[in-house]
């Protein structure tokens, strides 16, 4: 850090090189500004920067430069210093107070940003540090720009006392005020502990870095003292813990640059605020019918579904074939793998995809999948992104663990989120849509705008095996008493049930699906539906807010 001695009587400043700057001249004032600005680049000295680099990490400022378009960053409050004199802090007043704030562009689009500096008081939050974040939050809301937070800090600055807690509360409150107004994205680039974890939890997306990021409220030492448990930081709050187990993380990056690349991709699908439409690429409207514009990828969908309804297939194969350029930005890929969520485009239109995954639990919905999908649907609805559901769901996952942990209440979140959403909603039933899960996964009666089914769709109260056991219980028991072949009778009855009810045509006759289409026509139907629904208008009933079953 630059060593400076001020001689107030002589109105001069002595720089590290020994050159005295006369701050009463214009040239001297400019030189003094340059000195101060240079000091902001290494607020606690170059040795601290070297230690960060030795760990393979970037500094707070370097992270901002790496994420934003080159030369676009405009810094705010770079010269701010804390005001505390307690516990020797008066002798340590680094410029910036441990957080870099400002605004710039990503792919030419304006964003606001803050980046926490773990080299300054361990990244702990004090009064001025907190005020800087509050200020950039308010600027983002006022200007309708996405807010990106790069988090690398260790909780409250204990030396500053309760004022740190007050600023935490202001930050949390602003996160809540901004929710659904501007996209909020958090990158966790180090150990975020204590109060530092709640602000990211209130944002729309959290990106963590493998083997670098940790998030926890209480650390391993406290847990050991209180509960006797031995756990490492990585086990407790590492990136994969929060992806695979807690569902807190939305993406686990292989390194810092991968994290920045993901955020840039993510922003390409999001509008700047809730009054704007998501980015749309200019794609010519195809001439002729859907049939006239089929591609090889479209035709591949006709052979994707196995003949056996019990044989799984990878729903990713459907997703990539209906999206532009096979590009799908998946969200929370490692959590609740029985449901797939993410962003893509159809004929240039941004869409949010929610799809059952038959390779995991046969596509059944469980607690985690329900909450994962519900949160994503609400995010899409906040930012005017149409929702496309791809349905192959045999029901809710049975079991005492699910029941005891609240599948009724927590599964209802998905019902609520879908029914509440006012954006364009399109449903494609590829195979199974049974029972209550049919209702939850974008049924016409739950407010879907366009519902189509493939010929392979099985729309019914339950599958043939369960239905036959229930409907023909007495007949099967009588057959057993008479010494008849019960297994053969059961198979016959199952086939009759499937032929009569387990198909898409009963639902089509009643208008519960708008059309039964060849799988190859799916992309075309979605594209025409999106064009139709661009002007969709919904007038919700007046109320303060609903009461989602949290």
Task: Describe each model-derived feature in a short phrase.
Residues 2-550:
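Ligand-binding clefts of soluble mixed alpha/beta catalytic domains
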């Amino acid at each position: 850090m630059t060593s400076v001695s001020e001689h107030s009587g002589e109105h001069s400043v002595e720089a590290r090189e020994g050159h005295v700057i006369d701050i009463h001249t214009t040239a001297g004032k400019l030189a003094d500004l340059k000195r101060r600005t240079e000091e902001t680049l290494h607020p606690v000295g170059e040795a601290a920067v070297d230690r960060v680099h030795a760990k393979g990490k970037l500094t707070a400022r370097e992270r901002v430069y790496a994420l934003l378009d080159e030369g676009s960053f405009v810094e705010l409050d770079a010269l701010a210093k804390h005001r505390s004199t307690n516990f020797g802090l008066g002798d340590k007043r680094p410029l910036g107070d441990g957080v870099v704030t400002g605004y710039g562009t990503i792919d030419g689009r304006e964003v606001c940003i803050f980046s926490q500096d773990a080299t300054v008081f361990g990244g702990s939050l004090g009064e001025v540090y907190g005020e800087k974040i509050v200020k950039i939050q308010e600027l983002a809301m006022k200007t309708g720009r996405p807010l990106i937070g790069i988090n690398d800090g260790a909780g409250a600055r204990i030396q500053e006392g309760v004022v740190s807690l007050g600023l935490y509360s202001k930050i949390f409150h602003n996160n809540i005020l901004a929710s659904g107004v501007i996209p909020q994205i958090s990158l966790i680039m180090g150990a975020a502990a204590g109060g530092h974890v709640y602000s990211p939890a209130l944002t729309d997306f959290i990106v963590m870095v493998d083997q670098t990021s940790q998030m926890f409220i209480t650390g391993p030492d406290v847990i050991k003292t209180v509960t006797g448990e031995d756990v490492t930081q990585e086990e407790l709050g590492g990136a994969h813990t929060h992806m695979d187990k807690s569902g807190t993380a939305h993406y686990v990056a292989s390194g810092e640059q991968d994290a920045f690349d993901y955020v840039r991709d993510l922003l390409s699908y999001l509008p700047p605020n809730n009054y704007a439409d998501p980015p749309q690429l200019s794609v010519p409207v195809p001439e002729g019918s859907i049939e006239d514009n089929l591609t090889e990828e479209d035709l591949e969908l006709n052979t994707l579904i196995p003949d056996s309804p019990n044989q799984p297939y990878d729903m990713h194969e459907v997703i990539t074939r209906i999206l532009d350029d096979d590009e799908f930005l998946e969200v929370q890929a490692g959590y609740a793998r029985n449901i797939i969520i993410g962003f893509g485009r159809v004929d240039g239109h941004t869409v949010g995809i929610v799809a059952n995954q038959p390779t995991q639990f046969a596509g059944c919905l469980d607690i985690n999948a329900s909450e994962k999908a519900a949160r994503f649907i609400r995010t899409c609805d906040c930012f005017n992104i149409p929702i496309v559901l791809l349905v192959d769901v045999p029901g809710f996952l049975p079991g005492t663990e699910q029941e005891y942990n609240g599948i009724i209440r927590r599964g209802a979140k998905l019902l609520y989120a879908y029914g509440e959403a006012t954006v364009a909603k399109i449903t494609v039933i590829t195979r199974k849509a049974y029972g209550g899960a049919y209702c939850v996964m974008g049924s016409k009666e739950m407010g879907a705008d366009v519902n189509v089914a493939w010929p392979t769709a099985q729309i019914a109260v339950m599958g043939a095996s369960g239905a036959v056991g229930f409907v023909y219980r007495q007949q099967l028991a009588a057959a057993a008493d008479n010494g008849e072949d019960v297994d053969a009778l059961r198979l016959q009855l199952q086939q009759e049930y499937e032929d009569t009810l387990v198909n898409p045509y009963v639902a089509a006759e009643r208008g519960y699906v708008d059309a039964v289409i060849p799988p190859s026509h799916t992309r075309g139907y979605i594209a025409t539906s999106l064009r139709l629904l661009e002007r969709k208008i919904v007038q919700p009933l007046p109320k303060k807010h609903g009461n989602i079953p949290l």
